[in-house]
Curated annotation (Swiss-Prot):
Main function: Probable transcription factor required for superficial pseudohyphal development in response to nitrogen starvation.
Provenance organism: Saccharomyces cerevisiae (strain ATCC 204508 / S288c)
Any one cellular-component term (Gene Ontology): cytoplasm
Keyword annotations from UniProtKB, A to Z: Nucleus, Transcription, Transcription regulation
The name this protein goes by in its record: Superficial pseudohyphal growth protein 1
Subcellular location: Nucleus
Biased composition (Acidic residues): 291-305
Predominant place of localization: nucleus
Superkingdom of this protein's organism: Eukaryota
Span list, region Disordered: 289-308
Length: 346
């Protein structure tokens, strides 16, 4: 039994080959890119792409010093000129820095620095440099400085000082130095000219009498005129308006008049005529009754029938034979132009 027990214990043991495992647990790689001394990347496989971060240098508000300019208003009389006479030329000879007493002085170190530059405007020999380095050793401040208001302010100040140096008061009469002013071109009105001739709103034709008519009249056609049997112009206008409106439809046709000896009489319903007159009086008023005297005379003649009379009249034109007219029209094709007057009366 002892042997059996010993054999069981041997069978339950873990073999030595299973005790040691050659597997290595991988560690989470760094997301940053690592380079060796020879600028060769190490054999690493990161889980995400590494990002290259570039430091953003911001302008420190502590290292900016506003610069001002002053203009000397003392000028010699020989230097008085108009700067607007020459284009693209600006005279800044009298603009001096406040740190200089006269023109022969040299600019100091802090005056050569622009307010937009990242370089400190404090002199390198000044003891204030150590204070700034202790506060911000890298020259980077968390405050983002906006330079646009300062630039606008400096530009307006410079513009004001330049224009303030110009002589605002006129020169004395005893002064021999002339003040040059820009020459302005005088625009003369065409009305004041001696050669000006006012014209009317009339077109200037190439030909005084155009040979071709605008309206084309058919051959052997008549001009139909409507009149009233009682001689009233108002009634004739009403009759012609009604006839033109009814002739627009194909169903309403009137007998054609082929000669000047023919006459067409159409009886008229007087109630319709009175309806038109009342409607016209409501729209235009009593002033439209320009034939009131004739209407009073017509009222006395009740025995005359109320009717519309249509007569035909020939067109009177100075045209010649058709062949001669065709030749004239062909020769005047180049003259079909109208030129309006160049100068119109105002």
């Amino acid at each position: 039994m002892d042997e059996m027990h010993s054999s069981d214990t041997l069978l339950l043991r873990t073999p030595k080959s299973k005790k040691k495992i050659g597997l290595v647990i991988p560690s989470t790689p760094s997301k940053k890119c690592k380079y060796s001394s020879g600028f060769i990347a190490e054999d690493t496989t990161p889980s995400k792409r590494f990002r290259l971060y570039q430091a953003k240098f911001k302008t420190s508000s502590k290292n900016v010093k506003a610069q001002t300019l002053s203009v000397s208003i003392k000028k010699n009389q020989g230097e008085i000129t108009n700067p607007f006479m020459t284009e693209g030329y600006n005279d800044y000879r009298n603009i001096v820095s406040p740190g200089l007493s006269f023109d022969n002085d040299c600019f100091s170190e802090h005056e050569l620095v622009s307010p937009l530059s990242d370089i400190s405007s404090i002199n390198s020999t000044s003891p204030d440099v150590e204070k700034i380095d202790s506060l911000d050793p890298f020259g980077v401040d968390s405050f983002v400085w906006n330079c646009k208001p300062l630039v606008n302010k400096e530009a307006l100040e410079l513009h004001r000082m330049i224009h303030s140096s110009f002589p605002m008061s006129p020169l004395e009469s005893n002064s021999d130095v002339p003040l040059l002013l820009p020459k302005l071109k005088k625009r003369l009105s065409p009305v004041n000219r001696s050669t000006f001739k006012p014209t009317r709103y009339e077109p200037s034709h190439r030909l005084l009498k155009p040979k071709k008519s605008i309206l084309t009249v058919p051959a052997k056609s008549l001009n139909l005129i409507v009149s009233s049997s009682r001689g009233s112009l108002n009634d004739a206008t009403i009759f012609a308006t009604e006839i033109n409106s009814t002739l627009s439809n194909e169903e309403n046709k009137l007998p054609a008049i082929s000669s000047i000896w023919e006459k067409l009489t159409i009886p008229v319903n007087s109630s319709i005529k009175e309806k038109y007159k009342k409607l016209k009086d409501q729209i235009y008023g009593q002033a439209s009754n320009f034939g009131e005297d004739e209407d009073n005379e017509e009222d006395n003649e009740d025995d005359l029938p109320d009717a519309a009379v249509i007569r035909g009249y020939e067109f009177q034109s100075g045209r010649r034979d058709e062949l001669t007219q065709c030749n004239e029209l062909q020769s005047t094709k180049d003259y079909k132009k109208v030129q309006w007057a160049k100068v119109l009366e105002q």
